[in-house]
Amino acid sequence: MPSREQLHKYQDRMINFIYTTPKCALWAGLGLGKTITTLTAIVDLIDSMTVSKVLIVAPLRVANSVWHKEAANWQHTKHLKFSIVTGSEKERLGALHKTVDIYVINRENVHWIVDHYAKKWPFDMIVLDEASSFKS
């Protein structure tokens, strides 16, 4: 199982960028490790108590299968707890009531979650995965 020490120097720079830049974007090419880079930054932010509840917005397939599996593949992120907020409204509500580090929702349900929480937004950090798919 790979460890944090096996990340590339450019990934360490991206992690530092996320950590020091509250509103940022990572525009790195396909296969350059944006997911594990972001997960590592999330671990650092949780450890420093800068954030406690993270929402990741991703395409449905990615929301259901990528983030939690990638975290499980690395020594330093395997402890992260996830809740996948997809499916029927009943399933999404159940997923939101779990106590975890990271909630992952598909982009089609962004309006729903915003309406659901209204003025009591509980997330300290939002990650938009596949940002180019948010064209309008």
Predicted regions and their residues:
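SF2 helicase/translocase NTPase motor core
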Residues: 1-136
